[in-house]
């Protein structure tokens, strides 16, 4: 029996980036700390070691179970001591869906826990698949146990962790529908293991039918949940649906064998008919090439066996038994035997019980930490390597190829050759080009790519606009407060001149807007390219008949003898160009593969050890590896850089030869009159189709570059938005502190005769009235000045009704009278003593005598 593990679906691991945690009493930013072991506290070392171990689990080995469980348990433990937004930005790449290269960054402990548990479920799943590859009974039982634990972990994530996530929306590949689908899939594959074991050990057909029926139910539940998920791919949905129909057919087939044994010949026929129908339904899922060949082949074999038995059963029943065949609604529904149960490991359901000095997941599992600068250096090297390979080598080679095709197109090649060599029908290269576009679903592929790019650009713009709006709002708030309090008192830099972040952020606004402007222009150019060839691509992606209708036949079917020598030389020169292009394409693919396999980690760790020995006590930084990077890049890619010069020279030589031979060919063709008799129209049509094909290849390359650009830009705008949030929060906090400082009453306004409540009332009265008189500071000074030195103010004429408001020595002192009365008060006893000029202002305090 072939192993079923090859036909079961694995859950892939989610990938993450390195970071460090914060101590219990403060937030700790991953890119601000020094990773030298002597400078870390023990708890930081422990949690960093646990996380590093957990995120590096990438292979189905049992040692990874403890690593993931220990880290998950530690996360649960520290979530009781720290807030959920601990201050560490956890970056994880999705494992499902169509954005697996686009990470999601969250400052959220529950998000980190959800990812770690997801990887634990993936590990259980992959262990099940690797264990079941042997096919023996004990291995199958162990695989079923692993699938059961995978389902249990997914169930725990869905019911215990996801509700506590505290995010606006969960990641699309870990939402409730996706987790439900994965849980049901794990249970289905667990049930399939028990079914496989029963078949291998020769259980009764009735028992095997019950096991298969339950497996079919579980696959159906997984498919229904997958339809509600945005992350489960179409290929997975087709696979799961096919397995649902497969096990439904297998259940009915085994039930038919049981009926045969019990001499229920009519029911046997009905169940065989249903088995064939279910197998046909499963085979429909194979359309479009979604299924693995082994899955489809199993369905075909099952269908063939059921059809053979059905033919035999119908013949026997018609000739011998003559029993009625029940309809499908009349058939008794098969019983189910459910052996697949979601079992949550105790280390996951009660993790804190396994933490402690003497417990299973004790602290200080690892003491050695790799400096963070090394991880940064690896990223810097990979960025430099990719820039060197993609921009300096591959891009230049692609430019050479594009220039080559432009020159060939200007020479009407290969159209002029094909029109003369094959005056009737379709040339072979054209048929190959058309088939390639059809197989790739070229037009829909480009349109989907355009839609993806639009979606990515809109998402990036939305994130950027969110950050920019924060800056604009903060600037408006700052200007409003500056106008309210005055420039002298609002003594802090304006938003765009703030050296603490405003200058850099507003400069980034211009840079990112420039990115969007240039990318929008590039997108427009690519779309114009596509629109220019869309009609021709429609012809290429159509049938051969439509191609033949597009390409007219030449009325001359024989090549003139005088043209044949020049034609042969031109064909040879053109073939040299094609061979050169083919060699170049293979070299580019080999270079890409070499760059992908260029793993610097072992070498950079050795270089780290050398630097630490050479410079003891020095904190390593990424800049220390610059010379090492240069030496490595030169040794690995110097020959490829030299290849550019050779390719340029070779192409120039080949194209010069093609141009020379083409002139001879055109001259001979005109002399022989071979460019007439319908040849020009055929040549133009063939050339148009050939040019459209190479433009199509160019557009496909362009849209892939565009997609990568917007994915990379999403990281930039995401960091920009998060930095804006932090900076704006700090500016607002600073503004509140400055406003509180300004709101404190000046010392000159305090008087020993006033109670604190009177002083406060006086101050706020000043702030609210904003009288167009001397500033409060001047009024306070005048209250303590020599009265003889003050020039008398001209008393304001008062109406009689207000005379009673004038203060005299025989009247009590009144504060804050009706509006307008305080400013009109003047001394009434002018003759009793020398009057002091000025009207009384509450803001000036009280002056006696």
UniProtKB/Swiss-Prot annotation:
SMART domains: BRO1 (SM01041)
Protein name per Swiss-Prot or TrEMBL: pH-response regulator protein palA/RIM20
Subunit structure: Interacts with RIM101 by binding to its two YPX[LI] motifs.
Chain residue ranges for the region called Disordered: 475-502, 738-849
Annotated Polar residues bias: 802-812
Domain BRO1 as annotated: residue spans: 7-404
InterPro entries: ALIX_V_dom, BRO1_dom, BRO1_sf
Alphabetical list of PANTHER family matching this protein: PCD6 INTERACTING PROTEIN-RELATED (PTHR23030), PROGRAMMED CELL DEATH 6-INTERACTING PROTEIN (PTHR23030:SF39)
Keyword vocabulary terms for this entry: Coiled coil
Compositionally biased spans, kind Low complexity: 745-772, 820-835
Superkingdom field: Eukaryota
Xref: Pfam families: ALIX_LYPXL_bnd, BRO1
Annotated family: Belongs to the palA/RIM20 family.
UniProt cross-references to PROSITE patterns, sorted A to Z: BRO1
A single cellular component GO annotation: endosome
Function comment: Required for the proteolytic cleavage of the transcription factor RIM101 in response to alkaline ambient pH. May act as a scaffold protein that recruits the calpain-like protease RIM13 via VPS32 to its substrate RIM101.
Ranges in a coiled coil: 260-321
